[in-house]
Amino acid sequence: IPGAFYIKNFMQVEFYLKSLTLEDIPNHGTIHFICNSWIYNSKVYKSDRIFFANNTYLPSETPAPLLKYREEELKNVRGDGSGERKEWDRVYDYDVYNDLGNPDKGAALARPVLGGSTLPYPRRGRTGRPKTKKDPNSEKPSDFVYLPRDEAFGHLKSSDFLAYGLKSVSQDVLPVLTDAFDGNLLSLEFDNFAEVHKLYEGGVTLPTNFLSKYAPIPIVKEIFRSDGEQFLKYPPPKVMQVNKSAWMTDEEFARETIAGVNPNVIKSLEEFPPRSKLDTQSFGDHTSIITKEHLEINLGGLTVEQAIQSKKLFILDHHDYLIPYLRRINASATKTYATRTIFFLKSDGTLAPLAIELSKPHPQGDEHGPVSEVYVPAYEGVEAYIWLLAKAYVVVNDSCYHQLVSHWLNTHAVVEPFVLATNRQLSVVHPVYKLLFPHYRDTMNINSLARKSLVNADGIIEKTFLWGRYALELSAVIYKDWSLHDQALPNDLVKRGVAVKDPSAPHGVKLVIEDYPYASDGLEIWDAIKSWVVEYVAFYYKSDEVLQQDSELQAWWKELVQVGHGDLKDKPWWPKMQSRENLVEVSTTLIWIASALHAAVNFGQYPYGGLILNRPTISRRFMPEKGSAEYAALAKNPEKEFLKTITGKKETLIDLTVIEILSRHASDEIYLGERDGGDHWTSDAGPLEAFKRFGKKLAEIEKKLVQKNNDETLRNRTGPAKMPYTLLYPSSEEGLTFRGI
């Protein structure tokens, strides 16, 4: 009975082989081969292309005739680590992030290498491009960026709009906007909030004679549905669809820390005043200057000690990681503060901000500690806008941390080493390959696109986010403390003090904020993933010994830890991969990161951040001081002064264009609980049945989440903006839906 087949292409063009089905095999019926691969002319390959039937075998159980082919195919995919990779190659190998800068074009475009140095980083896929002249450690940027061929968007319509959209923003949209601003066709600043709202009503209009100088930009027609003089038209973001000023309320500001686009940073406040972990010799004393008096006026009769004891105080802390970079960031056109925000859990289950501390470096040197100021809620006169500005500085830090850490680092960059190790060490017939492979769809492609036009030197992120040229460097500083163990949702919640371990609770943890939409929905999804993984692992590994003797699995884990995440290889938290429990925990965590965690931090970007007033990405001026001309201007024209402080108009248009593309689902997206190729991904009935149960469970969870959103006693589910928290609904249509995993 055939277990594999070779294929040769004698044509000059490549073709995409989806699957092969052999019918009426004597004594066997039908055999399915799932291929999903581009086949080039056979001359470009060193060895013939082989595909295996959809049977699943541990290495020790592989039929003897197939063993040689199994090992050979893995060797082909690993390559030999040399040479520049070509379009048709299928080689997976590791490299450091040394292709973000372009030192040959000047020092302003040089960027440090991330990984293998004092700036640790997960590895990326190796391309083997030549090095730059100015820096022998940096790789030359190029138009063609190698990707193992089957990692490129191979599915048909596929997220192609993403690839093509991002490329078009930098190559087409940016130049038009730059010329329009330079030629005074667009005013440099928004004058008031109503002008921001106009973006969603009339869009950005430019004279036809100006637009006719440019070739038609297909993306503008397709994504921004514009015509005539309308250059860009944006759909109204969900956060303003019902109430245009909901974003200004304290309740919405607080709610977005637990149900917004960055819902996993807020922590329980365990000590008062909040302290810093920064070295006092280098940075002075960074203990917070927030006092009990600042808080107790709004604690409903409690003292700070009582509120901490009863777990009613929380902190959104954007202080320590930013301080060492703050002086450099503020030396550019941006001006900002490190922030600490204290929240109180009220009796109705909602959070209220009590105080915001803004800290900037001391003019006489870091060792003198920060210059800090504390702001408390105010709702009348100029002080109401001072408070609104204080919240805006907090959100700017939160936006940067969200984009560079919660989104890019924690759901994109850390996954790439798993993609590489899985392809290099686990055969396509290995059960763990089949379990994890669907969750890698497009990861390397999107990451490679990001390195080319989003997170590169002077790319879209550096242009539109406060951290500027330090954006990726700061994410490397934060990666030093990354741990796979903490990415598991229950561990993350306990570590942040927003849940406590409780064996009697449904998911083993009890939430401190009961109505915490991201956490309560997330635990349901986490549990469903874990149950599926437990069943799957038990089907193939009847004991821990079988797992310990699985040569491919052990090589996979060793390479992932020692090479893929090699800068952290000596950390004690890495599991040893000696038990089925280890494999379940690692696989569940990885699937969670690549599916639900990514959905929670990605698909809400436009619904929340599309209104720049709600999620500004840059601050350009410091807080006005009493008695200054800026303070008088704020009193006279508060909206204009607020807008002069946050993200500028040009940066806003670029930011909105990008996050609208990122927040969309493709028409052929595959959601959690679904598989490409239907039931043919494995020939084993047990896992197929378990997977169907997993799909059913997710559909049940979705019904439960819909009910929660209809429960008016759960105030954090919809908030003042009246936008139900739907980011962890498993299913979705295509487009901008604010849901879908």
Curated annotation (Swiss-Prot):
Monomer. Residues 133-144 have a biased composition (Basic and acidic residues). It is an enzyme of class 1 (oxidoreductase). One of its GO terms (cellular component) is cytoplasm. It catalyses: (9Z,12Z)-octadecadienoate + O2 = (9S)-hydroperoxy-(10E,12Z)-octadecadienoate; (9Z,12Z)-octadecadienoate + O2 = (13S)-hydroperoxy-(9Z,11E)-octadecadienoate; (9Z,12Z,15Z)-octadecatrienoate + O2 = (13S)-hydroperoxy-(9Z,11E,15Z)-octadecatrienoate. PANTHER family: LIPOXYGENASE. Gene3D superfamilies: 3.10.450.60, Lipoxygenase-1, Domain 2 (4.10.375.10), Lipoxygenase-1, Domain 3 (4.10.372.10), Lipoxygenase-1, Domain 5 (1.20.245.10), PLAT/LH2 domain (2.60.60.20). It comes from the Eukaryota. Its EC number is 1.13.11.58, 1.13.11.12. This is Linoleate 9S-lipoxygenase. Belongs to the lipoxygenase family. Plant lipoxygenase may be involved in a number of diverse aspects of plant physiology including growth and development, pest resistance, and senescence or responses to wounding. It catalyzes the hydroperoxidation of lipids containing a cis,cis-1,4-pentadiene structure. Pfam families: Lipoxygenase, PLAT. Residues 123-132 have a biased composition (Basic residues). Binds 1 Fe cation per subunit. Iron is tightly bound. One of its GO terms (biological process) is oxylipin biosynthetic process. Residues 108-144 are annotated as: Disordered. PROSITE patterns: LIPOXYGENASE_1 (PS00711), LIPOXYGENASE_2 (PS00081), LIPOXYGENASE_3 (PS51393), PLAT (PS50095). The keyword Oxidoreductase applies. Residues 56-741 form the Lipoxygenase domain. Its main location: cytoplasm.
